[in-house]
Amino acid sequence: MAVGSADNEFAVKLFRRLPRRYDLLAEVLSFGQNARWRAELVKHVAGAEPLQVLDVATGTAGVAIAIARSTDAHVTGVDVSEEMLEIGRARVAGAAMQTRIELKSARAEALPFGDGAFDAISFTYVLRYVSDPAATIAELARTLRPGGVMAGLDFYVPPSPPARAAWWLYTRAVLPVAGLVLGGRAWWDVGRFLGPNISGHYRRWPLARLLDAWEAAGIEGVEYRQMSLGGGIVMWGTKRA
């Protein structure tokens, strides 16, 4: 995850309490959908046959490892949480991919890489935690070479009224309790935080506004796929030559 504004320092502290059981509980609490969403994200990155990939908000390196397994690329993963990166490095070592994957501490809003340094960029669950999503998208695109592919994944609010009502009930009532039972107080806090955070983000940044931000950053042919009745969304596009 990547957090940049003072308003979201709460989120930084919140997620720093989660690394040890993050991957298991993320799958359980998303009914196994997180893995499907990640696979869709990786498909668009791998299809570009990149040699250098940047994975932003890499967390425990799940996406970075999946990209390395699906391509011949060298993957650089960045995150603001040293606790998550520590787990990620152990996972990379366990997968015997230390020569293929490098993990660093960095913020999505100010990447320590040159213009056009990467052939492809992936990012997950980032834009809800930055003060200016459009500026962050532009910063990501800056490090992408012309013709390179960028793909992002995040939660979404289901567009159909029945699915949205079920989603609202789950995120406001079921998710906090399930988190408490399975992961303790830290996951109770996350469960209470996520639903309102997701809803608030898309009130400020509806899909049309996000698409405009991608295009303003020089990404063309932007497409998206709503998944799991709209509970998740994957977006992708190519940097204008």
Identify the meaning behind each predicted range.
Residues 217-241:
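Core SAM-dependent methyltransferase catalytic element
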Residues 52-110:
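Class I SAM-dependent methyltransferase SAM/SAH-binding core
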Residues 21, 30-51:
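Conserved alpha-helix/loop element of class I SAM-dependent methyltransferases that forms part
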Residues 80, 157-213, 223:
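C-terminal alpha-helical "lid/dimerization" subdomain adjacent to the S-adenosyl-L-methionine
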